[in-house]
């Protein structure tokens, strides 16, 4: 196993590159949010209400939304269906969650999303159509969903860079070789 499994391939198919780019962003985001207590996860910068805890919960929602409703039309499930109160609910409500809950929510959503996206790729490939449509009923392709996830992570991994630096000074583009997120005492992924 590679010491840097999040690195995209140097030469590979379009699908391998898209999945590699997504996993690199996921890993970098998770590294930026890793190993913090409640205070660290709720740190804000200036007038912004963004926190690493809010980003963990928001990106868990995005992973579940993309890999259920948009991918297959399957209901998104809990906790997203019954707790939704307002547009920024995932960001705001994260203040009520423990670090363990936030990490488990994100880790679980990513694992589910990977499995669902892998199944869709095995079934129809990158050119397969998904449930999501435009206003005229035109169906989106799986490639679009992967690009949407990459865009979302690109935006929020940049936010996470700034937030984490404000918490404890951690900077850098990639986790150190061999890094794995910890849940309790066991590595994840």
Where in this protein do the model-derived segments appear?
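Acidic/histidine-rich alpha-helical segments that form the ligand environment
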Residues: 88-129, 141-154
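Short, contiguous alpha-helical
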Residues: 4-8, 15-88, 130-189
């Amino acid at each position: 196993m590679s010491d840097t499994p999040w690195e995209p391939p140097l030469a590979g198919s379009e699908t391998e590159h898209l999945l590699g780019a997504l996993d690199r962003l996921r890993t970098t985001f998770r590294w930026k949010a890793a190993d913090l207590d409640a205070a660290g996860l709720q740190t804000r910068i200036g007038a912004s209400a963004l926190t690493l805890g809010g980003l963990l919960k928001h990106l868990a929602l995005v992973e579940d939304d993309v890999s259920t409703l948009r991918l297959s039309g399957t209901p998104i499930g809990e906790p997203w269906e019954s707790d939704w109160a307002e547009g920024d609910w995932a960001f705001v409500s994260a203040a009520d969650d423990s670090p363990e809950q936030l990490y488990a929510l994100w880790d679980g959503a990513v694992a589910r999303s990977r499995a669902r996206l892998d199944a869709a790729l095995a079934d129809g490939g990158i050119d397969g159509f998904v449930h999501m449509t435009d206003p005229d009923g035109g169906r989106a392709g799986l490639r679009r969903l992967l690009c949407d996830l990459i865009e979302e992570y690109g935006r929020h991994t940049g936010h996470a860079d700034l937030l984490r630096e404000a918490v404890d000074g951690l900077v850098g583009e990639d986790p150190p070789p061999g890094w794995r997120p910890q849940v309790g005492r066991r590595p994840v992924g």
